[in-house]
Amino acid sequence: MAHVLPDLPYAYDALEPYISRQIMELHHKKTSSDLCECAQHCRGCLRHSTAVVGGFDLSLFFILTTLGHINHSLFWQNLAPAAGAGGQLKPGPLKDAIDQTFGGLDNLKKEFNTTTAGIQGSGWGWLGVNPSNKRLEISTTPNQDPLLNLVPIIGVDIWEHAFYLQYLNVKADYLNAIWSVINFDEAQRRYVEATQGSKL
């Protein structure tokens, strides 16, 4: 399977003022693109049984870059311009679940932001569905580790490349801002698929 950098479904400046054009361009064109290229290169080397190059274990590097690519591909779909679907939680199954589990969107944001801001170093904040009881849960993963115990509904990149140029080291400001461009339509589609096994 080829690793392909996904096109963004919006312009680089479409998430302003919450995420700057500069961040989006660098994050997508450089960081996300590099993950794809590295994963592809490692895959080619491993196909030819070159597992270690210059002291680096390419099988591990392949896994790390592939996981980063998967997380970022989900992240890009997670976002939408505030002038469109961004930040708009409409009535429906996801809103009902958020109300039932967290007592409303504001409470979800507060709990999610507190949990995610607590990550030491780089990682991801997640809202996911527990497959055993179909309930929403908040979780975090370090580095580019995937969300294994939950089905991802919303993922937020908390690596510095996602926010530092605009928010410096104030993670809380970035986390508060990103909710204005969360694509809740996509989140609801994922939620319905995770809980009912059907697609909207």
Swiss-Prot record:
- Reactions that this protein is recorded to catalyse: 2 superoxide + 2 H(+) = H2O2 + O2
Which parts of the sequence bind Mn(2+)?
Answer: 27, 72, 157, 161
Where does the UniProt annotation locate this protein?
Answer: Mitochondrion matrix
Q: What is its main location?
A: mitochondrion
Gene3D superfamilies noted in UniProt: Iron/manganese superoxide dismutase, C-terminal domain (3.55.40.20)
Recall the GO molecular function terms of this protein's record. manganese ion binding; superoxide dismutase activity
Q: What class of enzyme is it?
A: oxidoreductase
Q: Which InterPro entries match?
A: Fe/Mn_Superoxide_Dismutase (IPR050265), Mn/Fe_SOD (IPR001189), Mn/Fe_SOD_BS (IPR019833), Mn/Fe_SOD_C (IPR019832), Mn/Fe_SOD_N (IPR019831), Mn/Fe_SOD_N_sf (IPR036324), SOD_C_sf (IPR036314)
Q: Name one GO cellular component term.
A: mitochondrial matrix
Is the keyword Calcium in the record? no
Q: How is the cofactor bound?
A: Binds 1 Mn(2+) ion per subunit.
| Required cofactor(s) | Mn(2+)
**Keyword list, A-Z:** Antioxidant, Manganese, Metal-binding, Mitochondrion, Oxidoreductase, Transit peptide
- EC number, as in UniProt: 1.15.1.1
Keyword set includes tRNA-binding: no
Q: What does this protein do?
A: Destroys superoxide anion radicals which are normally produced within the cells and which are toxic to biological systems.
Q: Which family does it belong to?
A: Belongs to the iron/manganese superoxide dismutase family.
- UniProt protein name: Superoxide dismutase [Mn], mitochondrial
Taxonomic lineage? Eukaryota, Fungi, Dikarya, Basidiomycota, Agaricomycotina
Q: Which gene encodes it?
A: sod
